[in-house]
């Protein structure tokens, strides 16, 4: 159902005076350039996200249609005025479709460039994001597309949608008899279903059920390679991988099929180097090794027709274009070129036909299309005032700190900034210990902490970020002086990979980007867990432990956007503290500046989450009512409390403004 079929939001702030009046002075090109570099938007944004002249994040879901763009900050404010609750996912299905077109186009160019005669299919592994909006947006893109399943539930979803694609279905993962029968039923219905053998125990069941159903199975084999990528997901590939057959087992499978008279059923070769491959060299090495499997299987009389290179196509979460865990040092064209060339070269060298190439590029398709937007519910700033001099009879540690402070302001002093900082830290440490033993009063402790903050600020002003020797001190002080921002979201629900594997996601304010980022901040969620904090942020060409922030009003802080959360995060999110799924909307942007918004997920209520843990909301309401009736409160107040409790049960799990 469409919430707002045409919101009429302008596509470009510069073309509409109503938005121009929001800010008297448009952002200068110099400031724009600085902000783009600070947050690396030009690289991870991939032309989908940019900063407009108002200093707001703008979204262009299809870079081939640059006039179709929307001011995200203004969109969120408009939605809030219409009742939108935060946090919420803002999803852009047009980005999904553009990603699919872009990958298909890259492989088309590579095939034409190298004279490759085989076809290419992108098979979407729905485990990356199984939401209906994602699957159906990709299917309706008009592009060739296959679907991959890794479980019975996923296979049921894939088979139900298969009539819309009439393409390729790849079945991976552990399989029981029911899973295998479902896949064979799909084949018997006329779909091209590849059952990929991951364990030798599967083949006997496949042959048995194929005979029962009187269907010729279409099989694949997953080979376990010696080649392996690096990074956070490296264990999903290589010789120690959870899935796949070793070389000896591949030979055993071939002989089993030969003896059963089903060797012609083995048509697909599959391998997987790992997810989010950062280094193109690792990809090239793995494809060359797998190409040898293709050659050797043909020598054994196996007519492999499809070459499934699996996943691995990464995205640049950092925007550093590097080999780091959350970046990539290649683009779509280089990725496609390396795969097509390696397979084609092996075929030409051995006089073999060019197979159909399949990639399972789920992350690269989905990551960019979703932004989590939330509000800051509280800010704790390290505000400081320089205290007055201590009394003459004050303890020595206080006197020492004051002497250091005075020396910092004396002209011509030869002590280093680091030395000043170390002296003040040692004095403060002594005061904290003394406070615990009763030597110092609360007032004296507060005085020392205020003076230390003043010293940190003074040292920070004199440090040069371009001086490599100053960088460790700068990082230390930025952590010490950073604002604490309490954000209305659950890290465990909305960005579980940031908690579980320390993955980095681009995070930045949606507005105020027309100002120099002079402040630093750390982001904390609203769960009752110390792990509910983001530890790493983009900061130019590096990664920092604090987030650059433009100056802002702490009483009215900007909304924040958590970008590139479209892959895995919605599916992996957990229910810590019973925070549930957020609301989600699909946003469609058109060249005339109009915007269509559809509510795709209303988000979980408190009652929904309680039911997950077998706490029946009606029973809880009854128990609460019984308690209220036993109080000596007047009837009107009892009724008020009951109504508030019931409203809370069916309200949002996140914090809501009155």
UniProtKB/Swiss-Prot annotation:
Superkingdom, taxonomy of origin: Bacteria
One Gene Ontology cellular component: periplasmic space
Residues annotated as binding substrate: 307-317
EC number per UniProt: 4.1.1.19
Cofactor(s) required, per the database record: Mg(2+); pyridoxal 5'-phosphate
PANTHER family to which the protein is assigned, alphabetical: ARGININE DECARBOXYLASE, BIOSYNTHETIC ARGININE DECARBOXYLASE
Gene Ontology BP term (one): arginine catabolic process
Provenance organism: Escherichia coli O6:H1 (strain CFT073 / ATCC 700928 / UPEC)
Keywords annotated in UniProt: Decarboxylase, Lyase, Magnesium, Metal-binding, Periplasm, Polyamine biosynthesis, Putrescine biosynthesis, Pyridoxal phosphate, Spermidine biosynthesis
InterPro entries given in the database record: Ala_racemase/Decarboxylase_C (IPR009006), Arg_decarb_HB (IPR040634), Arg_decarbox_C (IPR041128), Arg_decrbxlase (IPR002985), De-COase2_CS (IPR022657), De-COase2_N (IPR022644), De-COase2_pyr-phos_BS (IPR022653), Orn/DAP/Arg_de-COase (IPR000183)
The family this protein is said to belong to: Belongs to the Orn/Lys/Arg decarboxylase class-II family. SpeA subfamily.
Protein name according to UniProt: Biosynthetic arginine decarboxylase
Protein's gene: speA
CDD domains from the UniProt entry: PLPDE_III_ADC
Lineage: Bacteria, Pseudomonadati, Pseudomonadota, Gammaproteobacteria, Enterobacterales
Pathway terms, separated by semicolons: Amine and polyamine biosynthesis; agmatine biosynthesis; agmatine from L-arginine: step 1/1
Localization per Swiss-Prot or TrEMBL: Periplasm
Function description: Catalyzes the biosynthesis of agmatine from arginine.
Catalytic activity of the protein: L-arginine + H(+) = agmatine + CO2
């Amino acid at each position: 159902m469409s919430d707002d079929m045409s919101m009429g939001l302008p596509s470009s702030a510069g073309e509409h005076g109503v938005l121009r009046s929001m800010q008297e002075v448009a952002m200068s090109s110099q400031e724009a350039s600085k902000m783009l570099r600070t947050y690396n938007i030009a690289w991870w944004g991939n032309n989908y996200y940019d900063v407009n002249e108002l200093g707001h994040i703008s979204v262009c879901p299809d870079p081939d249609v640059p006039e179709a763009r929307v001011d995200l900050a203004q969109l969120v404010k408009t939605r809030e005025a219409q009742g939108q609750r935060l946090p919420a996912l803002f999803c852009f299905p047009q980005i999904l479709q553009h990603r699919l077109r872009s990958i298909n186009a890259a492989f088309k160019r590579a095939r034409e460039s190298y004279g490759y005669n085989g076809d290419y299919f992108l098979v979407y592994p729905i485990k990356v994001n199984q939401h209906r909006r994602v699957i159906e947006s990709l299917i309706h893109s008009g592009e060739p597309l296959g679907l991959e399943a890794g479980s019975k539930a996923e296979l049921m979803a894939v088979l139900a949608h298969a009539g819309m694609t009439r393409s390729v279905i790849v079945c991976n993962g552990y399989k029981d008899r029911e899973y295998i029968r479902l896949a064979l039923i799909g084949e018997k219905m006329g779909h091209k279903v590849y059952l990929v053998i991951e364990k030798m125990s599967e083949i006997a069941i496949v042959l048995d059920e194929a005979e029962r159903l009187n269907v010729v199975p279409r099989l694949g084999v997953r080979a376990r390679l010696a080649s392996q990528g690096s990074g956070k997901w490296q264990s999903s590939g290589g010789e120690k991988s959870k899935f796949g057959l070793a070389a000896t087992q591949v030979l055993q499978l071939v002989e089993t099929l030969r003896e059963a008279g089903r060797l012609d059923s083995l048509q697909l070769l599959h391998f997987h180097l790992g997810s989010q491959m950062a280094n193109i060299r690792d990809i090239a090495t793995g494809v060359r090794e797998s190409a040898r499997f293709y050659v050797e299987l043909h020598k054994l009389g196996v007519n492999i027709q499809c070459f499934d290179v699996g996943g691995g196509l990464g995205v640049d979460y950092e925007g550093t274009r590097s080999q780091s865990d959350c970046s990539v040092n290649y683009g779509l064209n280089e990725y496609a070129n390396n795969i097509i060339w390696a397979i084609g070269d092996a075929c030409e060298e051995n006089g073999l036909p060019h197979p159909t190439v399949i990639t399972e590029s789920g992350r690269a398709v989905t990551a960019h299309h979703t932004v989590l937007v939330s509000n800051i519910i509280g800010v704790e700033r390290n505000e400081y005032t320089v205290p007055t001099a201590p009394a003459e009879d004050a303890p020595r540690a206080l006197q020492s700190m004051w002497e250091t402070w005075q020396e910092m302001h004396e002209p011509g002093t030869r002590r280093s900034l680091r030395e000043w900082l170390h002296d003040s830290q040692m004095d403060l440490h002594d005061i904290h210990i003394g406070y615990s033993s009763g030597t110092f009063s609360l007032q004296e402790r507060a005085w020392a902490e205020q003076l230390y903050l003043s010293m940190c600020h003074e040292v920070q002003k004199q440090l040069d970020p371009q001086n490599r020797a100053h960088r460790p001190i700068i990082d230390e002080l930025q952590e010490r002086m950073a604002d604490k921002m309490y954000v209305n979201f659950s890290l465990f629900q909305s960005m579980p990979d940031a908690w579980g594997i320390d993955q980095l996601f681009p995070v930045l304010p949606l507005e105020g980007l027309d100002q120099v980022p002079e402040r630093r901040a750390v982001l904390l969620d609203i769960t009752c867990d110390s792990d509910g904090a983001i530890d790493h942020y983009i900061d130019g060409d590096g990664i920092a432990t604090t987030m650059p922030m433009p100056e802002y009003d702490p009483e009215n802080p900007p909304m924040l956007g958590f970008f590139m959360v479209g892959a895995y995060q919605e599916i992996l999110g957990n229910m810590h503290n019973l925070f549930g799924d957020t609301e989600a909307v699909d946003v469609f942007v058109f060249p005339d500046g109009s915007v269509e918004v559809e509510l795709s997920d209303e988000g979980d209520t408190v009652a929904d989450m309680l039911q997950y843990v077998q706490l029946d909301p009606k029973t809880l309401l009854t128990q609460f009512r019984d308690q209220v009736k036993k109080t000596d409160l007047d009837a009107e107040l009892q009724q008020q409390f009951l109504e508030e409790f019931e409203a809370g049960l069916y309200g949002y799990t996140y914090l809501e403004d009155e």
